[in-house]
């Protein structure tokens, strides 16, 4: 009898506990709560302290300032002291306007609101937010504005936005879809760092510079459209973007920073334009890179070192790839000088293609390469000249080929491949190891070294 009473008491307690939990969940306000503000800074007067942590869906109409924003952050589970009990997940500010004034909304001596600016740290560390509509008048996204907003899966920025601050979306790894307005001209460094949920992105035509770390570790990114006006790609800009498989850089790009594409292990094809300056280890760890197209207008040593203090003396060509993985290299006729140790320790080099009618001085350019095991491809009728020349004559095999008719290296993304040939003029049905000659629909012809 006593045992039955204890069991009954236990079941009663379980029932009361479950009921309390259910009641707590039911206590959340899930319907949309719409609040119209007649004056900025009055949101705290509209929402009592007993309700602010229960509202999950909020729409605000009217002007809002720092005082209002401080409460919004509190309701979205973050304040100056860390995590709060806020449950705000859906926020509609489509009919709101951000204005200057009010209290600091982030730290007591930190950020204040400015007219039509989504300020620094506006939603930083608010993981509860899953759906957000910004005021239509916003023109700028501040630094760290959405940092660590892990709950956001998609976001459309207002059409008037022209600037995105540094680290603005850092660690928003839940973000899978993002539309950037056409008027955006500036994106801060580390802006999308660790957004590995993003799969595709189109950069607006006005963006001329991709700054350091902008897309660092966006491993889910498989499709990227770069604007034609792009001129510079910063340090580690795409480092760790292992999902990228092919990339054509706009012809206007003149500089690629150090480690810019390091760790892009999925990259298999790359097109570089002439006159480009490439930083050290820019393609380090690109183990899948098999096809590289480029042309050089300076002598090789000057070209590779131009504008950089980071010089890899072991193998300058590492600025294109990891030197130990290079099996073939095409040296354009525009190269007039081979600098000392230009290919030093490229131990896997198997083929070198040149097009000079008369051998130029090679000096110590191939020191440590082991050219006795390499094949040298030279213009027709010049095999004897190269055989008798210093350095060139030490190549294990010298083969003549016809390099004529090679017009230019194209970087156009519109041109389509029409046909592909070997250096002997044989039609190829697919890329073949060594030098391929490819004709395109725009009339251009490209030499492509396939490893």
Where is each model-derived feature located?
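Short, surface-exposed loop/turn motifs with a glycine/proline- and acidic-biased composition
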Residues: 422-442
């Amino acid at each position: 009898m006593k045992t039955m009473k204890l069991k009954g008491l236990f079941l009663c307690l379980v029932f009361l506990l479950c009921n309390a939990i259910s009641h707590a969940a039911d206590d959340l306000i899930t319907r949309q709560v719409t609040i119209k503000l007649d004056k900025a800074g009055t949101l705290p007067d509209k929402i009592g302290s007993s309700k602010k942590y229960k509202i999950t869906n909020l729409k605000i109409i009217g002007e809002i300032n720092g005082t209002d924003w401080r409460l919004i952050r509190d309701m979205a589970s973050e304040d100056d002291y860390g995590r709060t009990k806020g449950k705000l997940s859906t926020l509609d500010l489509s009919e709101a306007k951000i204005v200057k004034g009010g209290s600091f909304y982030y730290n007591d001596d930190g950020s204040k609101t400015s007219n039509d600016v989504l300020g620094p740290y506006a939603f930083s560390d608010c993981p509860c937010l899953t759906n957000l509509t910004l005021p239509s008048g916003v023109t700028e996204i501040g630094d760290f504005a959405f940092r660590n907003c892990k709950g956001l899966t998609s976001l459309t920025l207002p059409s008037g936005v022209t600037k995105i601050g540094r680290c603005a979306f850092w660690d928003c790894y839940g973000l899978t879809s993002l539309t950037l307005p056409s008027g955006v001209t500036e994106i801060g460094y580390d802006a999308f760092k660790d957004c590995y949920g993003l799969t595709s992105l189109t950069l607006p035509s006005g963006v001329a510079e991709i700054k350091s770390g902008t897309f660092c570790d966006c491993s889910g990114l498989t499709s990227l459209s770069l604007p034609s006006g792009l001129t510079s790609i910063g340090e580690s800009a795409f480092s760790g973007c292992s999902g990228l498989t092919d990339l054509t850089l706009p012809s206007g790009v003149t500089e690629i920073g150090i480690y810019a594409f390091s760790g892009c292990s999925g990259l298999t094809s790359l097109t570089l334009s002439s006159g480009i300056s490439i930083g050290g280890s820019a393609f380090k760890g690109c183990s899948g890179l098999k096809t590289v197209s480029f042309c050089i207008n300076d002598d090789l040593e000057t070209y590779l070192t131009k504008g950089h203090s980071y010089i890899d003396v072991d193998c300058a060509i590492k600025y294109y790839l990891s030197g130990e993985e290079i099996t073939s290299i095409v040296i354009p006729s525009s190269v007039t000088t081979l600098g000392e140790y230009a290919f030093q320790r490229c131990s896997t080099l198997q083929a070198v293609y040149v097009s000079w009618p008369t051998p130029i001085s090679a000096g110590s350019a191939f020191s440590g390469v082991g050219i006795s095991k390499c094949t040298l491809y030279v213009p027709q009728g010049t095999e004897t000249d190269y055989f008798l020349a210093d350095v060139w004559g030490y190549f294990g095999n010298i083969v003549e080929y016809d390099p004529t008719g090679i017009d230019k290296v194209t970087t156009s993304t519109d041109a389509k491949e029409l046909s592909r040939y070997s250096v002997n003029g044989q039609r190829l049905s697919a890329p073949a190891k060594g030098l391929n000659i490819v004709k395109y629909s725009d009339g251009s012809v490209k030499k492509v070294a396939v490893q």
